[in-house]
Design a protein with these regions (language model features):
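An alpha-helical repeat/solenoid feature that recognizes helix-turn-helix modules
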Residues: 2-26, 47-71, 88-119, 123, ...
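Alpha-helical repeat scaffolds
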Residues: 28-37, 72-84, 116-120
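Blade-loop segments of beta-propeller domains
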Residues: 38-49
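Terminal, non-catalytic domain-edge segments
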Residues: 234, 249-315
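C-terminal low-complexity, Ser/Thr- and acidic/Pro-rich disordered "stalk" regions positioned immediately N-terminal
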Residues: 285-385
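Juxtamembrane/start-of-transmembrane alpha-helix segments at the extracytoplasmic/lumenal side
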Residues: 381-396
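C-terminal membrane-anchoring or membrane-association module
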Residues: 398-415
Length: 415
């Protein structure tokens, strides 16, 4: 694969998909991505956004997928940027969803405490917020009272770690309601899914990933077979002969659609192989963080001796020791935290966005024109185009799944 010198944090989905599909982690492509991330963090002193904190979450996911410890990316603890829960909520429910996914990529990850934060972000705070924002009848949305396919699918992905866990029965029930709603939202003729009134590949891709996250085969489960077509069947109808995916049918290759279609197929492939969920990195050997010492006096910031605390409300570099006695986060911590929020940390469950509008999974919604999906206006992400080799590789994977889906379809018809 040709190394793209312009690889940026926006390349995260290709990195996640390729890495979780077994692409060599020592490749020049991944090394260049990591080098560019480090450079970008240094140039911005770690402060790369003031509104879309899911950027940090997705960086954590992609770097963990490469076997990197996100608590020490050249001295930056990326989890610290998720510490102020009010910041996460600027994107509505999207922020907490991706923060929880990022946190659970590595069982050793914890979000440091932030002395300046009104509400410190914790695993339980994130879970509670997502559950509190479930809509009546099941499902989740960015706003309003009607569930949204993409957000419902992503909420299920975020909560999937706790599915069928006796300590999280409320999570299991919420997921089941969400799955039931998705089944009803599926197009009865095409097997696909719509967002904002039109069918598209990304919504279908998110449903495929969501079902895989809880062990449901999206190509065989009877609840998701409509007119003989499954979500996998539908997703493959957006595949183009040059190897990528289109956003909506009849349009050219779209980078976002290609990324999401690709990693959805990777998630499905991993399910079929009995591997961990695409965002569950417990199968990887994560690099142990080395102890570092960083002088932050130039920034008028200080790091306390307690490595898990953030001082002055803005945290970027830490001292993290490679402690052989460091214990993994155990499941028995669940029961005593479900209702243990401090009285001063009551969560505002409103999904009210910041004034600039919401963004999730590349979909940008302008609050002044809430019916406008910017992906219609701008079909391609001009900053990062898929290379021919990448498209060819994805094309090969599509061919394999198309053949498997055809065989599966024949079996379904014969039942």
């Amino acid at each position: 694969m040709k190394t793209d010198k312009n690889l940026s944090y926006n390349s995260q989905w290709l990195v996640i998909g390729l890495s979780r599909n077994g692409y060599d982690k020592e490749s020049k492509y991944f090394k260049k991505y990591y080098e560019n991330i480090v450079t970008y963090l240094e140039e911005n002193n770690g402060d790369i956004t003031k509104a879309k904190y899911s950027v940090y979450s997705k960086l954590i996911i992609s770097l963990t997928a490469l076997g990197k410890d996100a608590r020490n990316i050249n001295g930056y603890n990326l989890l610290s940027y998720l510490s102020d829960f009010e910041n996460l909520k600027k994107q509505g429910i999207n922020g907490p969803i991706w923060a929880l996914i990022a946190l659970n990529t590595n069982s050793k990850y914890e979000i440091p405490k932030n002395k300046e934060a009104k509400i410190n972000t914790t695993e339980e705070v994130l879970i509670k917020y997502i559950l509190d924002n479930e809509l009546e009848g099941g499902g989740w949305a960015l706003s309003g009272t009607n569930p949204d396919v993409d957000i419902t699918a992503m909420a299920i992905q975020a909560l999937s770690k706790y599915y069928n866990d006796k300590d999280y029965s409320d999570v299991t029930k919420a997921i089941n309601r969400g799955v039931k709603w998705l089944g009803k939202a599926q197009n009865k003729k095409t097997g696909g899914f719509s967002c904002m009134g039109y069918e598209n590949s990304e919504s279908c891709a998110q449903v495929v990933v969501a079902l895989c996250s809880i062990g449901i085969n999206p190509d065989e489960d009877a609840r998701f077979i409509k007119s003989g077509k499954s979500p996998v069947d539908n997703l493959l109808t957006y595949a183009l002969k040059e190897g990528g995916f289109s956003h909506i049918k009849g349009t050219d290759v779209n980078m976002m659609a290609t990324e999401q279609g690709f990693y959805a197929l990777v998630a499905y492939s991993r399910l079929l192989k009995g591997q961990t969920f695409i965002y569950d990195m417990s199968d990887l050997n994560i690099e142990k963080p080395k102890k570092i010492s960083v002088d932050l006096t130039a920034n008028k910031k200080s790091v306390s001796s307690n490595e898990k605390e953030i001082v002055n409300g803005s945290y970027n570099k830490t001292n993290i020791s490679d402690d052989s006695n460091e214990k993994e986060v155990k499941s028995d911590k669940k029961s005593d935290k479900r209702n243990s929020l401090d009285s001063n940390e009551k969560i505002n469950s409103s999904s009210k966005p910041n004034e600039e509008g919401w963004e999730f999974e590349g979909k940008e919604y302008n609050l002044k024109n809430p019916g406008e999906d910017n992906r219609i206006v701008q079909q391609k992400n001009k900053s990062i185009e898929p290379t021919p080799k990448l498209l060819a590789g994805i094309g090969s994977m599509i061919i394999v799944f198309a053949a498997a889906s055809f065989i599966g379809k024949r079996k379904r018809v014969g039942r």
